[in-house]
């Protein structure tokens, strides 16, 4: 009886000590609106995160990028999953910093034209009409504009630009209503590969970017550095289970084949250059909001 009591006491003491060291954090995802979608699409990730850290994570739903920034600034959310373009603005507004990069395979953009267009180089696009994706998107707007700038074309003044959905841009290029499109390369290829009635060489990519900076998990400036480092280490040390949690739902298929890596703010300087070349040199507000 005494042995049982002793074992029970030790178990209780360990559990109490573990619980005393555990924290409760609030977690947001910038491109997922509503608690129901958060639970469905990111619930397995939250569970894996809790298992890896021993902490509790509570979802905090945000309905916009601005709301995520305000929540970080108001210290009502602690960790945020976001993309590179969003991070650059949120960092400027709140001093939040990245702790883990969500390395996506084949995450780059491309400039695409029709093969029969007579357009062979990026310089040939001066004065032409180009379709870009959603305003403010890293890979569908900012990145292709940066590619133009890298080749000496001012994306603000040297081209006639429109913004539309990827599918509409693809149809417009196919019909000759635009001269080129700038898009996330992998996403456009999935649309292109569905066009089984078109010959293989109907389109051509005349330029592509390098691999883009990662999506990331960022931490609010109010979170103690040692606590942020603890979460970072737990994620990296348990990356297999964390990745399995992220990719459990089909809405996160873009992360299939991903890696989790430690990352620093300087990795996003290229995105800051994108903002500047797109005509937003202050990067202190979200484009399109």
Feature map (PLM): residue ranges:
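Pocket-lining segment of extracytoplasmic ligand-binding domains
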Residues: 117, 129-227
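Beta->alpha turn/N-cap motifs
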Residues: 29-31, 61-65, 75-88, 102, ...
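Bilobed "Venus flytrap"/periplasmic-binding protein-like clamshell domains
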Residues: 23-50, 85, 108-171, 253-257
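An extracytoplasmic/periplasmic, membrane-proximal ligand-sensing/linker region
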Residues: 23-28, 33-44, 223-289
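A structural signal for short loop-to-beta-strand junctions that line the ligand-binding cleft
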Residues: 95-103, 206-207
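A local structural motif
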Residues: 50-61, 76, 150-164, 200-202, ...
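Bacterial N-terminal signal peptides
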Residues: 8-16
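Sec/Tat signal peptide C-region and signal peptidase I cleavage site
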Residues: 16-22
């Amino acid at each position: 009886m005494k042995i049982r009591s002793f074992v029970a006491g030790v178990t209780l003491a360990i559990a109490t000590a573990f619980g005393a060291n555990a924290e409760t954090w609030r977690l947001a995802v910038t491109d997922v609106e509503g608690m129901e979608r958060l639970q469905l699409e990111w619930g397995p990730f939250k569970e894996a995160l809790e298992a890896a850290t021993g902490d509790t994570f509570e979802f905090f739903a945000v309905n916009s990028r601005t709301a995520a920034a305000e929540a970080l600034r108001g210290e009502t959310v602690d960790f945020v999953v976001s993309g590179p373009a969003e991070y650059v603005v949120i960092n400027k507004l709140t001093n939040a910093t990245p702790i883990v990069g969500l390395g996506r395979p084949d995450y780059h953009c491309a400039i695409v034209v029709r093969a029969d267009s007579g357009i062979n180089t990026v310089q040939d696009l001066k004065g032409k009409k180009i379709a870009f994706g959603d305003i403010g998107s890293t890979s569908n707007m900012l990145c292709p504009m940066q590619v133009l700038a890298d080749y000496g074309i001012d994306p603000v003044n040297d081209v006639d630009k429109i913004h539309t959905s990827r599918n509409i841009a693809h149809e417009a290029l196919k019909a000759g209503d635009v001269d080129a499109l700038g898009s996330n390369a992998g996403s456009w290829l999935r649309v292109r590969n569905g066009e089984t009635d078109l010959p293989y060489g109907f389109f051509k990519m005349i330029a592509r970017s390098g691999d883009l900076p990662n999506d990331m998990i960022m931490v609010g400036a109010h979170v103690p550095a040692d606590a942020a480092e603890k979460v970072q280490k737990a994620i990296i040390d348990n990356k297999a289970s964390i990745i399995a949690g992220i990719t459990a739902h089909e809405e996160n298929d873009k992360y299939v084949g991903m890696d989790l890596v430690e990352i620093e703010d300087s990795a996003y300087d290229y995105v800051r250059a994108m903002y500047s070349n797109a005509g937003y040199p202050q990067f202190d507000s979200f484009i399109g909001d």
